[in-house]
Amino acid sequence: MIQPQTCLNVADNSGAKKLMCIRVLGTNRRYGHVGDVIIGVVKDATPNLTVKRSDVVRAVIVRTKQSIRRKDGSRLRFDDNATVIINKENNPRGTRVFGPIARELKDNGFTKIVSLAPEVL
């Protein structure tokens, strides 16, 4: 469950390392889960890359510590909360994605991120 003021890791090579959620997009949404789009501010960034510190960006949640319940009854839980920074067309701003991501992103229309990921669980 991601809510405003939650700090997340960034799982791509766009230049940001840490992101703080300031809004979960959707009508009156309080919590975000895997596959939800958030608005966040970059808290830590690598110098000389496309995303700078204090930039306001859109991102999609790819991993959460809160377990994901699947239709078959199984549960999936990750070690960290992570996002991938996206543009207005829901395409990733980076060219690589690090770490595993959940299969639920494919159902939400983020096929480009799924194709870049090294492992889909």
Swiss-Prot record:
One of its GO terms (biological process) is translation. PANTHER family: 50S/60S RIBOSOMAL PROTEIN L14/L23 (PTHR11761), LARGE RIBOSOMAL SUBUNIT PROTEIN UL14M (PTHR11761:SF3). One of its GO terms (cellular component) is cytosolic large ribosomal subunit. This is Large ribosomal subunit protein uL14c. Transmembrane segments: none annotated. Pfam families: Ribosomal_L14. One of its GO terms (molecular function) is structural constituent of ribosome. Keywords: Chloroplast, Plastid, Ribonucleoprotein, Ribosomal protein, RNA-binding, rRNA-binding. The keyword rRNA-binding applies. InterPro entries: Ribosomal_uL14 (IPR000218), Ribosomal_uL14_bac-type (IPR005745), Ribosomal_uL14_CS (IPR019972), Ribosomal_uL14_sf (IPR036853). Binds to 23S rRNA. It is found in: Plastid, Chloroplast. The gene is rpl14. Signal peptide: none annotated. Its main location: plastid. The keyword DNA damage does not apply. It comes from Emiliania huxleyi (Coccolithophore). Part of the 50S ribosomal subunit. Belongs to the universal ribosomal protein uL14 family. SUPFAM superfamilies: Ribosomal protein L14.
